[in-house]
């Protein structure tokens, strides 16, 4: 809320796109806008047809990041383990704090009220015995609410909801379920799992069937686990909507992180890709490698394959790569199917590039396909390294 402007939370409003050209998509919407049928992810032009008086303002990503850090700092002060789920969502694992905080509902109200009083915005808090139930509970009635969703409450609170409200269930899956006569989460939970898998695929069907029954054994992963490696990510001014755009950034990032890793004499056995969509949901996809590597080209090939597997060109504003499971071992398991000649050739290329950059600077040699992105990626990576060195 800015001085002289109405409170966007109390009027039909949305964040996203250019209000003058009416281009772009809705990143977030107010509760009054939701009553007009405005939905996150739809074109601004469509939202304006639903609600002609809709106030549309461009996103201030610097402000969002500042608010996010402040919000997460407060949350982290209460929990031994915190996992970021998106720019404005976290999971808190309160295991072992029962003597300090015996009443989880009372604690949730304390956290919620503190965020409102200190930061000026409201949050919903969901309480459950696993991440799924806590997330589902947080999406109940808004704003500024605390909700519980314990196993005994699933039949009354979760099962009556439409299947589209189930976490990670997309529009395509919703249409398949409705066509099969499955309209609520409860109907899905009572349906034979084999039939759900037949409709949605074996892996996806199993996961969503488990979710429909309130089961989720994924742990809350602390932020420290993510620091044992090399990573780079880039927030863009324009939406990333094609593989060509994404690969240009990812190749520049692979160049930077692989060079840092080689400088430290390390190799990685795991490569992951992370991206953030316009609704601020973040997704990650990773792959374990058969052999540890520090070769830029080999890493980039895996990154490309990962992105093909997990991304269908939804608009993005942030994308990144991470190299983990590090080793200093030079041993490499030989394979009959491996092109060892190409591996050695690429290692030599990386060595020459590293040497030139060390002697003359990073800007002296740049891949042609990354000329528009390499400088920005390198500058941000350097700033991240300096900040890490300062804090270590």
Report each predicted region and the residues it spans.
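DNA-contacting surface of Y-family translesion DNA polymerases
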Residues: 165, 173-316, 388
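Short small-residue beta-strand/loop micro-motif enriched in glycine and branched aliphatics
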Residues: 56, 281-285, 330-332
